[in-house]
């Protein structure tokens, strides 16, 4: 059969059929009848279109010989034979320019004279059976169906055959010839019997054994077996009364399907209340680093040695005092804790040999800050069964918080470039396959765009802090260990740099379960005056600890240096995910890759180089009250990375819930934009589910605000 196909059909048609089978993962050496069927279908589509034009007067004419003087437009747009992405691009373009309704399945042709899509069918069976199967699958009055058979029969929607008698006769003659040629070679019977109906994957997929019994058991009431249920579902009219069907299925259901129009959605309601506060485990845009370049000191790489070396670079220490107290805490204890850190670091420096780790003295201020002996005593449940008024602690509902501008500023800052390189290119051997070459080229381009990004600094800082804290939690369970907050990078000139952001002191850490909590006190350097946005620093006690000389264009100036101190906590599972923050790079690279793939499939060649090197082109980054924001491909990379990093830094049940529920609304809005006429029921319930996730989390509130901007501009 394969030899026959290659002899009988035009090489271009054979090549297109090969590509189509490859795209669907089918082997033409095995599925030879399918190979022949695809070639036949392609040829009929091309013959349907051949010689049909529209002249200047808009009339349909048949021109067999090319007349160079005629200003003619092809009557039919051929969609069949293109790869799926390109085919859908053509369909979307036609819908946009002609106002035609977008079909649910890829049609074969578009008729510019009748302004309709056409589905061509070629069958080896009865034409009316195949026609009904096609109509049942497409379920659209706007796509015209035209079926041909190898016996010369044809059938079309409303008996409207589109083409003139002669053009259709040409197609029928060609099909009859193919049949005769196959019969002469003894191939026809096998080819005729191999045709299957317009099936879906589910119909072909036989369910047997345990799965079959489970399927039969899990049917809605009033259905005895899966076949009955399937037949019932297949009988649903596409535009019939769904509400009635639902109420037939169950007396409990009384859903009413409402059309979803541009005027239907309302903005998500953000909560009122005091402004939200910073809740990340470490400072982001407000962090200050004490740094050493080209570190070569004794013990370089040992965190405590590096920290002491960094501390020595600063000479502006002064007697610390509180500038912004914590509303509920015993603030003098925070001040005493910092003084204790300074004193114990001084003690280390006075020793002959600096130790590798430092356990702090268990002073009253540290015991208070780390919640030592604060946990209620655990009692075995069996010992208190008889207590009549046994109940769980009453816990207050969380206070609602409103969106504050600082979180948008944090995000903007995370997208910016720094003057340091935070990740190196992976050391990978020579590429051995073309796909590896493309993958490493994409990775290298992407790395170049994000290696200087502040979000990448947050990744490396997060990885370091979580790794150090988890190690200390396992290695020194009973100790109040001092953990320097360190990161490493390179300057633009390539010199190595070690940075100190501050210190963590961890509490007792007998972590048996993944969710068991270890308390810690963080002390972080900053030049940000907390009195400018006191609501952001609700959970912090802020000290002024020194004065820093800064060089600027107008000379040297002195700025107060602050220390942001707070009690915090984390768990084994959170630290494990914190150590995995490099995954954010992979996630955002995959998102960029899917953009490149879409572009490449339209252009039918790899577009990686053009994608990254065409600096003049702009891409959509996100929504703001001003509209769709656009930027360079580098800005897109950094924005996607920052979103992924913030999802990690601000991970919470509120974020999980908001992401899952708002996605449903997003899909409905997208369906409306694609003219799919979506319908919804209980839209109010969906809004309720979304809005119950908007409590006090700054990142969730910002995402909800972005979603509202998207709704405004998407539905204009």
Swiss-Prot record:
UniProt keywords, alphabetically: Cap snatching, Endonuclease, Eukaryotic host gene expression shutoff by virus, Eukaryotic host transcription shutoff by virus, Host cytoplasm, Host gene expression shutoff by virus, Host nucleus, Host-virus interaction, Hydrolase, Inhibition of host RNA polymerase II by virus, Manganese, Metal-binding, Nuclease, Phosphoprotein
Cofactor note: Binds 2 manganese ions per subunit.
Molecular function per GO: endonuclease activity; metal ion binding; RNA binding
Pfam family of the protein (one): Flu_PA
Residues the entry annotates as binding Mn(2+) 1: 41, 108, 119-120
Source organism, top-level taxon: Viruses
Catalytic activity, EC: 3.1.-.-
InterPro entries the UniProt entry points to: INFV_PA, PA/PA-X, PA/PA-X_sf
Motif position, Nuclear localization signal 1 (NLS1): 124-139
Enzyme class: hydrolase
Cofactor(s) needed: Mn(2+)
Modifications after synthesis and translation: Phosphorylated on serines and threonines by host kinases, including human casein kinase II.
Residues that coordinate or bind Mn(2+) 2: 80, 108
Gene Ontology cellular-component annotations: host cell cytoplasm; host cell nucleus
Residues spanned by motif Nuclear localization signal 2 (NLS2): 184-247
Compartmental location: Host cytoplasm; Host nucleus
GO biological process, one term: DNA-templated transcription
Record HAMAP family: INFV_PA
Subunit text: Influenza RNA polymerase is composed of three subunits: PB1, PB2 and PA. Interacts (via C-terminus) with PB1 (via N-terminus).
Family assignment from sequence similarity: Belongs to the influenza viruses PA family.
Functional note: Plays an essential role in viral RNA transcription and replication by forming the heterotrimeric polymerase complex together with PB1 and PB2 subunits. The complex transcribes viral mRNAs by using a unique mechanism called cap-snatching. It consists in the hijacking and cleavage of host capped pre-mRNAs. These short capped RNAs are then used as primers for viral mRNAs. The PB2 subunit is responsible for the binding of the 5' cap of cellular pre-mRNAs which are subsequently cleaved after 10-13 nucleotides by the PA subunit that carries the endonuclease activity.
Identification of the protein by name: Polymerase acidic protein
């Amino acid at each position: 059969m394969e030899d026959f196909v290659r002899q009988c059909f035009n090489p271009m048609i054979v090549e297109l059929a090969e590509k189509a089978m490859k795209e669907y993962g089918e082997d033409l050496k095995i599925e030879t009848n399918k190979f022949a069927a695809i070639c036949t279908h392609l040829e009929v589509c091309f013959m349907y279109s051949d010689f049909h034009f529209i002249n200047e007067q808009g009339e349909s004419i048949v021109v067999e010989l090319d007349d160079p003087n005629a200003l003619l437009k092809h009557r039919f747009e051929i969609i069949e034979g293109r790869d799926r992405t390109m085919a859908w691009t053509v369909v979307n373009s036609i819908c946009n320019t002609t106002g035609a309704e977008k079909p649910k399945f890829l049609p074969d042709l578009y008729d510019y004279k009748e302004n309709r899509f056409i589905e061509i069918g070629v069958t080896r069976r009865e034409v009316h059976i195949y026609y009904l199967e096609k109509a049942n699958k497409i379920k659209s009055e706007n796509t015209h169906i035209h079926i041909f058979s190898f016996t010369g029969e044809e059938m079309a929607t409303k008996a409207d055959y589109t083409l003139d008698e002669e053009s259709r006769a040409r197609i029928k003659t060609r099909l009859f010839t193919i049949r005769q040629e196959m019969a002469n070679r003894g191939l026809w019977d096998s080819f005729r019997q191999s045709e299957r109906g317009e099936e879906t994957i589910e119909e072909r997929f036989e369910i047997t054994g345990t799965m079959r019994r489970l399927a039969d058991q899990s049917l809605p009431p009033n259905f005895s077996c899966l076949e009955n249920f399937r037949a019932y579902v297949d009988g649903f009219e596409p535009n019939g009364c769904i509400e009635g069907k639902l109420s037939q299925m169950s007396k409990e259901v009384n859903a009413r399907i409402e059309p979803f129009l541009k005027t239907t959605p309302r903005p998500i309601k953000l909560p009122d209340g005091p402004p939200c506060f910073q809740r990340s485990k470490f400072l982001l845009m407000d962090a200050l680093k004490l740094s050493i370049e080209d570190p070569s000191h004794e013990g370089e790489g040992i965190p405590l040695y590096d920290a002491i070396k960094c501390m020595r670079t600063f000479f502006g220490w002064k007697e610390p005092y509180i500038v912004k107290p914590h509303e509920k805490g015993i603030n003098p204890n925070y001040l005493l804790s910092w003084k204790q850190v300074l004193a114990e670091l001084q003690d280390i420096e006075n020793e002959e040999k600096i130790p590798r780790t430092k356990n702090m003295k268990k002073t009253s201020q540290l015991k208070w800050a780390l919640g030592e002996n604060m946990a209620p005593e655990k009692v075995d449940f069996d010992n208190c069964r008889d207590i009549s008024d046994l109940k769980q602690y009453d816990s207050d509902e969380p206070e609602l918080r409103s969106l504050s501008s600082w979180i948008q500023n944090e995000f903007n800052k995370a997208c910016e470039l720094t003057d340091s390189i935070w990740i190196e290119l992976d050391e990978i051997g020579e590429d051995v396959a073309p796909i590896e070459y493309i993958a490493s080229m994409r990775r290298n381009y992407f790395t170049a765009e994000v290696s200087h990004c502040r979000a990448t600094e947050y990744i490396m800082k997060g990885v370091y802090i979580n790794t150090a804290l988890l190690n200390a939690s396992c290695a020194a369970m009973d100790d109040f260990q001092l953990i320097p907050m360190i990161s490493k990078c390179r300057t633009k000139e390539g010199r190595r740099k070690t940075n100190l952001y501050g210190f963590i002191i961890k509490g007792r850490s007998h972590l048996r379960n993944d969710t068991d909590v270890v308390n810690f006190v963080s002390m972080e350097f900053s030049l940000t005056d907390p009195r400018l946005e006191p609501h952001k620093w609700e959970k912090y006690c802020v000290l002024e600890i020194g004065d820093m000389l800064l060089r600027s264009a107008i000379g040297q100036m002195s700025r107060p240096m602050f220390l942001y101190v707070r009690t915090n906590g984390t768990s084994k599972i959170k630290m494990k995910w914190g150590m995995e923050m490099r995954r954010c790079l992979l996630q955002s690279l995959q998102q960029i890759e899917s953009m490149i793939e879409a572009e490449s499939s339209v252009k039918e060649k790899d577009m990686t180089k053009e994608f990254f090197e065409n600096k003049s082109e702009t891409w959509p980054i996100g929504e703001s009250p001003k509209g769709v924001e656009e930027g360079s491909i580098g800005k897109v990379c950094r924005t996607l990375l920052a979103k992924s990093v913030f999802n990690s830094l601000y991970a919470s049940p509120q974020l999980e819930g908001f992401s899952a529920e708002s996605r449903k609304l997003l899909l409905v809005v997208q369906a409306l934009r694609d003219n799919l006429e979506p319908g919804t029921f209980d839209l109010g319930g969906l809004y309720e589910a979304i809005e119950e996730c908007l409590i006090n989390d700054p990142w969730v509130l910002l995402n909800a605000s972005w979603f509202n901007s998207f709704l405004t501009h998407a539905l204009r």
